[in-house]
Amino acid sequence: MRFVGNRVVLIGAGDVGVAYAYALVNQGIADELCIIDIDEKKLEGNVMDLSHGVVWAGKRTKVRKGTYSDCEDAAMVVICAGAAQKPGETRLQLVDKNVNIMHTIVDEVMANGFDGLFLVATNPVDILTYAVWKFSGLDHSRVIGSGTVLDTARFRYMLGELYDVSPKSIHAYIIGEHGDTELPVLSSATIAGVSMRKMLEKDPELEPRLEKIFEDTRDAAYRIIDAKGSTSYGIGMGLARITRAILNNQDVALPVSAYLEGQYGEEDIYIGTPAIIDRSGIHRVVELEISDREMSRFKHSAQTLRAIKDEIFPVGE
């Protein structure tokens, strides 16, 4: 890889892209943010608005309208562009529309000499991250999807509300597809250092309460989309967290969409799992110790993604 500084190129300034840009600028994560969008007038307004807010941020981030030529020396290209999820529409139903959009974007990025990392947020994110990897020709460690970073945040937040403890003291992951087949990993989860597995053994009535929390986690996007049209702030902050881990070389475990090479008995798919993130991208995938029931649910999630992936990228082609 070759790049200078911490320039981030954001492609797509819709609700998610702008929320990410705001989080990035507000937290002072990048040196420079170049934004590309097909709506030039709205983009100009967003760039002005964000630039004025830099005065009160902790770090001076240069925000400007970008072009694909800015990708040449960028550390990261973050893709938030694509058709939006409509009320009642699953993430996987978006796939046909958005794969073609990814192909066009990635071709432009790579044609301009990009040699950094891709971070993909467009849904269905696991499938589209695989598509970006295929279209780019980069090593899979350099193509990352937002995965279950938002689902995990939602799950930890709701557990924190139940137990009246900070979500930062909760270590519990949502893994699998960022979508309807995702699953919680309770067998290795802890709350303030206390094993959730042991809590379940002591209190069998806890299981249905936790299942309800998981269902609320899984279905949160549908409720938010129905209420306000899109999800934006949570995923924007999740993307900013991944970006900070990369640019600051943090070697931190985050639940992202990562390429599997035998972990969990699966390979050649992108799927949500904890992974160690540093300046090089995905340093390694963390294979959690999960129960037989959790493994069965994970396999179902992987098979769901694989079926869609194989339709787009047939095996052997």
Curated annotation (Swiss-Prot):
Quote the subcellular location field of this record. Cytoplasm
Q: Name one GO biological process term.
A: glycolytic process
Q: Does the keyword ATP-binding apply?
A: no
Could you tell me the EC number(s) of this protein? 1.1.1.27
Which Pfam families does its entry note? Answer: Ldh_1_C, Ldh_1_N
The record's catalysed reaction(s) read: (S)-lactate + NAD(+) = pyruvate + NADH + H(+)
Gene3D superfamilies from the entry?
A: Lactate dehydrogenase/glycoside hydrolase, family 4, C-terminal, NAD(P)-binding Rossmann-like Domain
Activity regulation info: Allosterically activated by fructose 1,6-bisphosphate (FBP).
- Class of enzymatic activity (EC top level): oxidoreductase
SUPFAM superfamilies named in the record: LDH C-terminal domain-like, NAD(P)-binding Rossmann-fold domains
Q: What does this protein do?
A: Catalyzes the conversion of lactate to pyruvate.
Q: Which NCBIfam families match?
A: L-LDH-NAD, PRK00066.1
Put simply, this protein is called L-lactate dehydrogenase
Tell me the gene name. Answer: ldh
